[in-house]
């Protein structure tokens, strides 16, 4: 199955945006979730966990700070990969003036649904460009 970014909704938040390209609810037979996350400059995704799924983060571009399992933060940059076991608390912050672009997976998929309840969520329909706002 081919999925184009133009055919996928954009979830926009105060800290950045996400496009989920593959989810169990959107792609028949899929058991994992895969998407692109953009963390805006100087922003971040606060401490949280995914009780039922491991997460893998691959840094496409940019730099930031990552915390895993309430441990000490460490630097992440283009080419780095971070594995987060199921249930482990973690956070990701962009520490530069450029966007931090990530590929994120959840296994098993479905944990992305929790973001639908985020108070700062704005959902942009497929094909509509999400407006970026400086905080």
Regions found by a protein language model. Name each.
Residues 44, 51-78, 88:
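A short beta-strand-loop-beta hairpin characteristic of the jelly-roll/cupin
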Residues 30-32, 49-50, 95-96:
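Short glycine/proline-enriched turns and hinge-like loops at secondary-structure junctions
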């Amino acid at each position: 199955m081919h999925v184009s970014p133009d055919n996928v909704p954009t979830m926009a938040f105060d800290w950045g945006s996400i496009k989920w390209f593959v989810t169990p609810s959107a792609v028949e037979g899929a058991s994992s979730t895969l998407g692109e996350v953009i963390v805006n400059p100087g922003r971040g995704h606060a401490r949280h966990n995914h009780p039922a799924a491991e997460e893998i983060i691959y840094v496409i571009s940019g730099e930031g700070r990552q915390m895993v399992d309430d441990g000490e933060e460490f630097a992440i940059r283009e080419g780095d990969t971070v594995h987060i076991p199921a249930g482990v608390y973690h956070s990701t912050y962009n520490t530069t003036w450029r966007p931090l672009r990530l590929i994120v997976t959840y296994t098993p998929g479905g944990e992305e649904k929790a973001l639908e309840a985020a108070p700062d969520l704005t959902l942009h329909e497929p094909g509509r460009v999400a407006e970026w706002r400086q905080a």
